[in-house]
From Swiss-Prot:
GO terms for cellular component: cytosol. It comes from Jannaschia sp. (strain CCS1). The lineage of its organism: Bacteria, Pseudomonadati, Pseudomonadota, Alphaproteobacteria, Rhodobacterales. This is Probable transcriptional regulatory protein Jann_3380. Keywords: Cytoplasm, DNA-binding, Transcription, Transcription regulation. NCBIfam families: PRK00110.1, PRK12378.1, YebC/PmpR family DNA-binding transcriptional regulator. GO terms for biological process: regulation of DNA-templated transcription.
Length: 255
């Protein structure tokens, strides 16, 4: 059941992203600009920028938006953003990591703290929940990329650490392959996988929970409200929480 729960969570987040497409484009553009400003504006010479551009393309960010974001970094008139991670607890003690990019640290800290408080959580100190997660590279492929054995062999050859496959109960849109690797190996692993399996659905750095808390319907609803409220903030780039929910609860959440 745990595997299904994880995949159901992923599908819920994907649905949420579709609703927030304009915000997703804005967040992706900001990451591209920051990555280009910190390194070379050529994605082939800047691993972070390459991954940012790839991830933007995976959620259909238009080419001209990507190009403008890179040009903004090289034009010298872009804002200076600080990357700040906030950590706290949501309903039922679920650990939450919030990654932000901000041009006003005081504003962002105040908004994030207020959002936690208003939605049944509390903001902690940096490091208060980080030990419950590992920083990992994550590459996802659709089921059509190959069977579990094919993906496993490709992942081993590429230097990955782990593979999770979910068949989606016969629905290809609900299943897929998730390949995990060390955060420092993501660029090399993703390149090797693409040479073998073709273009991935997603390639990014994530926080992978080392332990999870299973939630019932009421707590799951509260947590989703917290996550959704955090994601509404333009300064917030990603929100990660160490929860699982059953297929039954997921179905009720989706109603």
């Amino acid at each position: 059941m745990a595997g299904h729960s994880k995949w159901a969570n992923i599908q819920h987040r994907k649905g949420r992203q579709d609703k927030l497409r304009a915000k997703v484009f804005s967040k992706m553009s900001k990451e591209i600009t920051v990555a280009a400003k910190m390194g070379d504006p050529d994605p082939d010479k800047n691993p972070r920028l390459r991954l940012a551009v790839k991830e933007a393309k995976s959620v259909s960010v238009p080419k001209d938006v990507i190009e403008r974001a890179i040009a903004k970094a090289t034009g010298g008139d872009s804002e200076n953003y600080d990357e700040i991670r906030y950590e706290g607890y949501g309903p039922n003690g679920v650990a939450v990591i919030v990654e932000t990019m901000t041009d006003n640290k005081n504003r962002t800290a105040s908004t994030v703290r207020s959002t936690f408080t208003k939605n049944g959580g509390n903001l902690g100190e940096t490091g208060s929940v980080g030990f419950m997660f590992d920083r990992k590279g994550q590459v996802t492929y659709p089921l059509s990329a190959g069977d579990a054995d094919t993906i496993m062999m490709a992942a081993i050859e590429a230097g990955a650490e782990d593979v999770e496959t979910n068949e989606g109960d016969g629905d290809e849109d609900l299943g897929g392959h998730v390949i995990w690797c060390a955060d420092t190996d993501l660029n090399d692993v993703s390149n090797a996988l693409e040479a073998d399996l073709g273009e991935s659905e997603s390639t990014k750095l994530v926080w992978r929970p080392t332990t999870t808390t299973e939630l019932g319907l009421e707590d799951a609803q509260k947590l989703m409200r917290l996550i959704d409220a955090l994601e509404e903030d333009d300064d917030v780039q990603t929100v990660t929480a160490n929860f699982e929910i059953s297929d039954e609860v997921m179905a009720q959440l989706s109603e």
